[in-house]
Amino acid sequence: MPTPVSECLYCQRNETLSKLMVRICDLEVSQLFLFKEQSYHGRCNVVYNDHTVEFHELSDDQRNAFMRDVARVGRAIAKVFSPEKINYGAYADKISHLHMHLVPKYKDGPGFGGVFEMNPQKTFLSDEEYAGMVEKIKAAL
């Protein structure tokens, strides 16, 4: 059953969201967040502005605009962090609000050659480190 708007962490901008992510900026039709758990250095989420669950619910123009946002963030991550590969994931099994995980992968890093862990709970940074990453990503957009 889809998450109702009243319980959606992306729509409500609740405490759970602030524990998981740092807001970076608004994009064309979405918002960009830095995932606080940084086992995959540079991991971000691109979150569609409206409470939509599935890609097929978007019009062609909406879908294309969302994917432009995703591609823009992918280019910024590539520029700032130089990963070997970026994995893209749109699951929304538990949080039914359209969003895309952008997960940089590094040859000698965790999960290279496989699927990334959703939240390994291993690598957290200081507020200053998050702020520095946010500024670098913003500058690369």
Residue ranges and their predicted role:
Residues 1-141:
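HIT superfamily nucleotide-processing domains
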